């Protein structure tokens, strides 16, 4: 027998590479000797493996059990993409707010953007200890209070039916600064902040022909679907809808509009002042009601609502964004994505994918839910960014891919999908079919 341990590596080659010809995994790192050589790692040194670089490998020899029997896969969510849509009260008392944001928005967005370290990667393990591997495949310095890719947009409004989407979320903060120009010059004075939020969510709620809704994306605003979508409510006014429109205004409540936001996974960051108060209630009532209705809250139930001023609005915007990046609970679940150009499809070999907390440091899986109705809990609710959460992936027998003279591989990525913010982490997976020694 030229291959005593039946791992696809001839005994003579095992000896030449410092391996045990009677042990298919000489260094006990769960990667077979033949597969380590094919992947360029050292089969005699446990610290040299694909797992050490964050790539998870399972061997599926033809008509034999999987090795290891399952993979325990950790992922760690961080907000990658975020859209901050500045919904601006355009009345005269807000002029200084506009000028403050025009002066500092570009710098604020830069401060909120994670620093790209300029290194390509497939997993966090390939980055420095203070960094993680972004979904785009770059090592980024991760403070837990930044996002990799931030878009901004601007709306202006004053009274009912004056909402205008000046610029939808896009990648240039400088373009949003230009969209802020001329702010504080709106013709109305009886502000309708709740109605403005309703228009941002659904343009059909506005009767004006100037609303300029986006042609694509989420809501009239045009949020990216694969981003944390943040309606940033900025006003110094309470509900002052004109008496002539009282019946129509009554159709739009902060809690009700917030619920419409929740149905589209739009979150609310409220920056309010109380300097222009008349009409009904307070500016806080609207700011907090939108946040409550949209379920934009921390684990303790508190909302991202800040009383501000024109001198503080820029700092409060940054603080609110940073706290959302670190304190907004996420609902996350895994999604397998096949990679092309290999020996077959990965998905058919998986028999179970289930939440698992047995790896060191993994969050409890007690509250995991069965989001895809397959009988196994895989969806974690209430996960804070940066938490380590884990799954167990089990495999059936490989009866379809025969061995060749060289190792064969099937590749896939396990994306971590957040209901609130799209893809928030990923992991590269490999099925390895060991070769057959002639």
Predicted regions and their residues:
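Cysteine-rich, disulfide-stabilized extracellular repeat modules
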Residues: 5, 17-20, 27, 39-40, ...
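A short beta-strand micro-motif common to beta-rich folds, especially ectodomain repeats
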Residues: 407-420
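Divalent cation-coordinating acidic motifs and surrounding scaffolds
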Residues: 47-128, 135-402, 418-438
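Extracellular calcium-associated, cysteine-rich motifs in secreted modular proteins
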Residues: 1-60
């Amino acid at each position: 027998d030229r291959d005593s341990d039946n791992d696809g590596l001839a005994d003579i080659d095992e000896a030449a590479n410092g391996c045990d010809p009677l042990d298919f995994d000489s260094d006990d790192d769960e990667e077979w000797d033949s597969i380590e050589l094919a992947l360029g790692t050292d089969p005699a040194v446990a610290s040299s493996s694909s797992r050490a670089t964050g790539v998870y490998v399972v061997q599926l020899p033809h008509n034999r059990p999987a090795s290891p029997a399952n993979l325990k896969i950790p992922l760690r969510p961080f907000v990658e993409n975020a859209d901050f849509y500045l919904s601006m009260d355009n009345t005269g008392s807000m002029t200084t707010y506009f000028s403050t944001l025009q002066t500092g928005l570009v710098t604020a967005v830069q401060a909120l953007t994670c620093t790209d370290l300029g290194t390509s990667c497939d997993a966090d393990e390939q980055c420095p200890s203070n960094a993680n591997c972004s979904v785009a495949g770059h090592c980024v310095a991760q403070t837990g209070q930044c996002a990799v890719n931030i878009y901004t947009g601007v709306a202006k409004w004053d009274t009912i039916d004056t909402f205008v989407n000046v610029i939808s979320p896009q990648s240039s903060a400088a373009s949003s600064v230009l969209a802020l120009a001329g702010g504080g010059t709106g013709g109305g004075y009886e502000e309708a902040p709740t109605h403005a939020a309703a228009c941002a969510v659904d343009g059909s709620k506005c009767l004006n022909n100037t609303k300029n809704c986006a042609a694509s994306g989420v809501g009239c605003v045009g949020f990216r679907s694969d981003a944390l979508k943040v309606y940033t409510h900025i006003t110094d006014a309470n509900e002052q809808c004109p008496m002539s429109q009282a019946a129509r205004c009554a159709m739009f409540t902060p809690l009700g509009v917030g619920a419409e936001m929740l149905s589209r996974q739009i979150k609310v960051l409220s920056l309010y002042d109380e300097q222009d108060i008349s009409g009904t209630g307070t500016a806080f009532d609207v700011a907090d009601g939108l946040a409550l209705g949209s379920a934009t809250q921390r684990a303790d139930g508190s909302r991202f609502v800040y009383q501000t001023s024109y001198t503080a609005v820029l700092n409060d915007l940054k603080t609110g964004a940073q706290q959302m990046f670190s304190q907004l609970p996420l609902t996350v679940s895994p999604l397998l994505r096949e990679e092309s150009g290999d020996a077959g499809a990965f998905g058919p070999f998986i028999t179970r994918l289930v939440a698992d907390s047995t790896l060191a440091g993994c969050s409890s899986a007690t509250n995991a839910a069965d989001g895809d109705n397959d009988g196994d809990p895989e969806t974690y609710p209430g996960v804070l960014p940066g938490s380590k959460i884990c799954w167990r992936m089990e495999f059936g027998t490989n009866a379809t891919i025969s061995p060749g003279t060289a190792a064969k591989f099937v590749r896939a990525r396990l994306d971590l999908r957040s209901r609130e913010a799209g893809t928030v982490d990923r992991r590269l997976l490999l099925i390895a079919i060991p070769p057959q020694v002639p």
